[in-house]
Amino acid sequence: MDESALTLGTIDVSYLPNSSEYSIGRCKHASEEWGECGFRPPVFRSATLKWKESLMSRKRPFVGRCCYSCTPQSWDRFFNPSIPSLGLRNVIYINETHTRHRGWLARRLSYVLFIQERDVHKGMFATNVTENVLNSSRVQEAIAEVAAELNPDGSAQQQSKAVNKVKKKAKKILQEMVATVSPAMIRLTGWVLLKLFNSFFWNIQIHKGQLEMVKAATEMNLPLIFLPVHRSHIDYLLLTFILFCHNIKAPYIASGNNLNIPIFSTLIHKLGGFFIRRRLDETPDGQKDILYRALLHGHIVELLRQQQFLEIFLEGTRSRSGKTSCARAGLLSVVVDTLSTNTIPDILIIPVGISYDRIIEGHYNGEQLGKPKKNESLWSVARGVIRMLRKNYGCVRVDFAQPFSLKEYLESQSQKPVSAPLSLEQALLPAILPSRPSDAVDEGTDMSINESRNAADESFRRRLIANLAEHILFTASKSCAIMSTHIVACLLLYRHRQGIDLSTLVEDFFVMKEEVLARDFDLGFSGNSEDVVMHAIQLLGNCITITHTSRNDEFFITPSTTVPSVFELNFYSNGVLHVFIMEAIIACSLYAVLKKRGSGGPASPSLISQEQLVRKAASLCYLLSNEGTISLPCQTFYQICHETVGRFIQYGILTVAEQDDQEDISPSLAEQHWDKKLPEPLSWRSDEEDEDSDFGEEQRDCYLKVSQSKEHQQFITFLQRLLGPLLEAYSSAAIFIHNFSGPVPEPEYLQKLHKYLINRTERRVAVYAESATYCLVKNAVKMFKDIGVFKETKQKKVSVLELSSTFLPQCNRQKLLEYILSFVVL
């Protein structure tokens, strides 16, 4: 591994607040808010920051603004220019100044007094929920329908018995579903959590300006929906605790029924949690559960009608990879349906970003190694609490994005020209199999005709809800602060995999920090860089080896090479991936374009077409689309790739060729028909642009040169390594398909593929050991299903895979492998 990548000079003055109290080692006794940043001029600048002033003199970026394109009215709502300057606050730092009392006794009882003064009472929460849900027309119809199915030809008396039986079943379901919030339990839990959080977290930081926006939203007398990313089981308690501390009523939390365990389930119910099935629609026999769906719909409608707040985890389950997973919009669809029926005037949506230095679960190595997930139990919860009390988990940062109007979003989408989304098969097959008949291209073009805006149209409704879910998750992910462990893990895996001196690691940490801030992401730490790096190394524990070198009396830091340790480091490294993912996609696409050019022996090997690079990158975005939300749904991959190439030009990594150089391009290069190998929708053109836009049809394609400077080349290499594990997993899965003999049940195939990847890692064939995580195995197989490599059928509720007719020929499977390998930098 080239140890000069991201070379970035000497050290240090970190992104410091004026108050020295906020260094990592002293944040237990930190002041309530972080001040403005003091600075000295940095001795060095990074590869991409040469084009702008050092960030040492600028304020923290304010994250979480809503989308101006989709919700322009919400953009100015709740926000004012003073909001960003309100600074951060450590929620678990409580003393007498946070109460109405002063003196020695107040200092001793500050936690009790603080909890007692919080505004929480029974009248805040929903009443008569079970009765109102059972009496709703939709539930009554569902009960009658299910009863009729149970007794299709019975007498009136038998029908009445069937109805009563179904009603009893409905009441039993609602007992599990409906929460009975207890203000006393919220207060008690608040006090316990204040004690516990102070024992195993350094701090829990929130932005006071963001909380001001949330408070302003609560005064609108509308229901609020909090939609956080899901990293840990602590997420359930964290939001309720923060809102309680700020006198905002607790939300009703949608929890998976895997947490419905004795004693613990009672606590969750008392705090506002309600349990739902993992799959909303299915009964044990695989049929649609009309009754359950009606009860869930009625429950959500009743809570929203009573202006209650909800907390929904769109990812459905905790992320095992450290990345924000793709959205599961089942429960969100119920919220949208409620608003569409005009039951309530509006709903305010609040995405929430949550970042941990270290999650309390520590890692998910067991599941990533293919072991079955252990069911939660009271004993496992107790063991988890005991384990937590013996460790420190560093810092936590919670960011509340700007609330936006769901009604405004839905109305704006209904008025926009909306094209049917391009499937992965339509987007990628023409690039993978260019000699194949272009029916997929024609299909994609036909689908671009504007469809009916009738909200009753099912396909439009599904697309609308899916886009909304992606919008929310992208904003929540963009709001997540980057933690010290994320940066250190990333540097050790993709910058210094062979190890590095501590002083150099600190220098690169400092620069990575500036790179993150330059891209308008916030940091979840502050203090001297050396202290912060040591803090992160301590938290990463056995994943890192520290040795003392007598050569220069330095500490040498090396990432552990064992598979579980690499998996764990990759989990934390993925916390910073979304900051650089678009640039990493451009870097890998740049390699693919240059690699193709090199094999063909073009006359001007130093020049590449900007349009070709953008389209290549857009296709890679499609390939990686199962790895999470890459962009806002109101943007296209073509658009964001074009913008990212523009940033590369700003950085100086790419330069626009002089006119004389462009005129010397050989006809073979200028007339390449690569554009005919991709569907037209990949060539994005906005309907809102002027004729003079840079994207105008008259614009001539320009040609670019790649900077040959050492630091630019090293930065490109670093970006390419970030996607290395993903691309290696996908290419290895493509190799494994060569010996496919089906049909095969999907669970069995996943197990075999995962075993193959683990064997590659154990035999040290794999470049990146983290390419063998079970998450990447599942995503690779899903991608193959989406592009039409596999046909999927259901047999006894089990998904069965077999090769599609397109990929039965071995040559087409080879082309799939070659296409993926074109992006892989060896």
UniProtKB/Swiss-Prot annotation:
Predominant location: mitochondrion
GO cellular component: mitochondrial outer membrane; mitochondrion; plasma membrane
Intramembrane segments: 88-118
Entry EC number(s): 2.3.1.15
Protein keywords: Acetylation, Acyltransferase, Lipid biosynthesis, Lipid metabolism, Membrane, Mitochondrion, Mitochondrion outer membrane, Phospholipid biosynthesis, Phospholipid metabolism, Phosphoprotein, Transferase
Positions carrying N6-acetyllysine: 778, 782
SMART domains: PlsC
Binding residue positions for CoA: 278-279, 288, 293, 328, 462
Domain of life: Eukaryota
Intervals of motif HXXXXD motif: 230-235
InterPro entries referenced in this protein's UniProt entry, alphabetically: GPAT/DHAPAT (IPR022284), GPAT/DHAPAT_C (IPR045520), GPAT/DHAPAT_LPLAT (IPR041728), GPAT_PlsB (IPR028354), Plipid/glycerol_acylTrfase (IPR002123)
Important for mitochondrial localization: annotated segments: 80-120
Gene Ontology biological process: CDP-diacylglycerol biosynthetic process; diacylglycerol biosynthetic process; glycerophospholipid metabolic process; phosphatidic acid biosynthetic process; phosphatidylglycerol biosynthetic process; triglyceride biosynthetic process
Metabolic or biological pathway, per its Swiss-Prot or TrEMBL entry: Phospholipid metabolism; CDP-diacylglycerol biosynthesis; CDP-diacylglycerol from sn-glycerol 3-phosphate: step 1/3
One example GO MF annotation: glycerol-3-phosphate O-acyltransferase activity
List of residues that carry Phosphoserine: 380, 686, 693
Membrane topology: Peripheral membrane protein
The reaction(s) this protein catalyses: sn-glycerol 3-phosphate + an acyl-CoA = a 1-acyl-sn-glycero-3-phosphate + CoA; (9Z,12Z)-octadecadienoyl-CoA + sn-glycerol 3-phosphate = 1-(9Z,12Z)-octadecadienoyl-sn-glycero-3-phosphate + CoA; sn-glycerol 3-phosphate + (9Z)-octadecenoyl-CoA = 1-(9Z-octadecenoyl)-sn-glycero-3-phosphate + CoA; sn-glycerol 3-phosphate + octadecanoyl-CoA = 1-octadecanoyl-sn-glycero-3-phosphate + CoA
PANTHER family in the record: GLYCEROL-3-PHOSPHATE ACYLTRANSFERASE (PTHR12563), GLYCEROL-3-PHOSPHATE ACYLTRANSFERASE 1, MITOCHONDRIAL (PTHR12563:SF16)
Function: Mitochondrial membrane protein that catalyzes the essential first step of biosynthesis of glycerolipids such as triglycerides, phosphatidic acids and lysophosphatidic acids. Esterifies acyl-group from acyl-coenzyme A (acyl-CoA) to the sn-1 position of glycerol-3-phosphate, to produce lysophosphatidic acid. Has a narrow hydrophobic binding cleft that selects for a linear acyl chain. Catalytic activity is higher for substrates with a 16-carbon acyl chain.
Domain notes: The HXXXXD motif is essential for acyltransferase activity and contributes to the binding of the cysteamine moiety of the acyl-CoA and the phosphate moiety of the glycerol-3-phosphate.
Family affiliation: Belongs to the GPAT/DAPAT family.
Protein name: Glycerol-3-phosphate acyltransferase 1, mitochondrial
Gene label: GPAM
